[in-house]
């Protein structure tokens, strides 16, 4: 009996094909599976982001303000906020003449606007209206200046001082001023104000207040539009408009005139009003009419002296008494300096 081997069809399938296995590519590691696909996706994402950034930059560049001057159109993205806000480049803010919207204009650095060239003064960089307002703010108000027509004198005049001096020129003729009864000037230098001066001086610690009226100083013009300088501790300042010049001259009429007539025009005199308290035991010493009591002054470059006249008034705590005012009424009482015009 013969045994023939049976051919098996599965033998070939049981054998490992090493050649085919060697020629095949090794499988990618687990962490690298799909790497080509992920790299391409990230690259596309980067390209998308760069395109978006470029679009944003283009939009910003399109929205950047430009100079509104015709023929310029400079982009102001790199300029300061001031120039971007007003849409003008720095060189054109200093030009004397530019064209904006078809009209000649000039940039005002105070208003930050364009104005017509006629609104500027020469080489000024600001318009005339703004310069006027700016200069008005820079001017400081005058200090220690008061009008003689005001009700009271400033309190600063009575701080640590016992003397207030008013100076004017008495050489001018009396008829230089208007002597008619219809004069529009009003007298505010009342006797109550004289009392107020004395009370203020006593509050400041002074036992008496002297108001020295020095005639013959060529400093006053009789025009009401002139200024009256104050001669005293603060001589650097001048008085304001002489609205009440007549008031002082009316008071002068009580001093410069004698009890029976006018003083010689060629003889210069000065007068002193002395206020003394009736409650005090001591009184102010009288000023002699000769010796060193003469008040010096200058007339036409020559040093001269005047003889003072002293009128002493008693100041009571409750009442103020002026017993001799009526007896010294001047003979020219019908004029503007008459006693009857003092209220």
From Swiss-Prot:
UniProt GO MF annotations: DNA binding; zinc ion binding
Motif mapping: Bipartite nuclear localization signal: 124-140
Binding-site list for Zn(2+) 1: 67, 72, 89, 92
Ranges annotated as SBP-type zinc finger: 64-141
Signal sequence coordinates: none
Pfam families xrefs: SBP
Annotated region (Disordered), positions in chain: 1-48
Keyword match ATP-binding: no
Keywords annotated in UniProt: DNA-binding, Metal-binding, Nucleus, Transcription, Transcription regulation, Zinc, Zinc-finger
Superkingdom per UniProt: Eukaryota
Entry GO CC: nucleus
Tissue and organ distribution: Expressed in stems, leaf sheaths, and young panicles.
Segments of skewed composition (Low complexity): 7-19, 37-48
Keyword Phosphoprotein recorded: no
Cellular compartments annotated: Nucleus
Domain text: The SBP-type zinc finger is required for the binding to DNA.
Protein name per UniProt: Squamosa promoter-binding-like protein 11
Organism encoding this protein: Oryza sativa subsp. japonica (Rice)
